[in-house]
Amino acid sequence: MADKSDLNALSGRFRGYYPVVIDVETAGFNAQSDALLEIAAVTLQMNKEGWLLPDETLHFHVEPFEGANLQPEALAFNGIDPTNPLRGAVSEHDALHAIFKAVRKGIKDKGCNRAIIVAHNANFDHSFVMAAAERASLKRNPFHPFATFDTAALSGLVLGQTVLAKACLAAGIPFDSSQAHSALYDTLQTAKLFCELVNRWKKLGGWPLPTAESE
């Protein structure tokens, strides 16, 4: 098990939280009534020098839950056809069960206490994950019920940008707008962005925190 006093360990960096980057594509803005259509998750790791890096990736197309609203404007925006059999969609239960299982393993392997969602405008993604988990009656939800790390807010502070594409470009991360609004692509880019923000703070001397002995 990782040593939480090791500031170069993932468990020592975020107060025992295990950060997992999430992006969802949906059929609207209401997590209670509108369909979850796609979800991707990227776990993170810390190397021996304490630099944050993307780790494993999970990605699922999701079947709309029974009675879900499908807002035409949202479908036109993300380009998803929920009726297309080639999507290979799975149920909310199966998608989240697989993600939660992988996240719980990561928490254990990294010596962390609980997972926390990292996302761009994180309240949106968090609300859909929580609503889908409740509908699927998944009791062992590893994510914090309300705390998140929001890369939109962090990017506004560090880069002066809040739009994902602009924040990535400002951070020197390529962003292909033609692939935007794919949960997989957006999650991968958000993971790179979050790692860059955390690592940049370390390079600038913001982490580890100064101690009385080092002053």
Curated annotation (Swiss-Prot):
Mg(2+) 1 binds at residue 23. The record marks 29, 77, 124, 146 as: Important for substrate binding and specificity. GO terms for molecular function: 3'-5' exonuclease activity; magnesium ion binding; nucleic acid binding; RNA exonuclease activity, producing 5'-phosphomonoesters. The keyword Membrane does not apply. GO terms for cellular component: cytosol. InterPro entries: Exonuclease_RNaseT/DNA_pol3 (IPR013520), RNase_T (IPR005987), RNaseH-like_sf (IPR012337), RNaseH_sf (IPR036397). Residues 20-194 form the Exonuclease domain. Belongs to the RNase T family. This is Ribonuclease T.
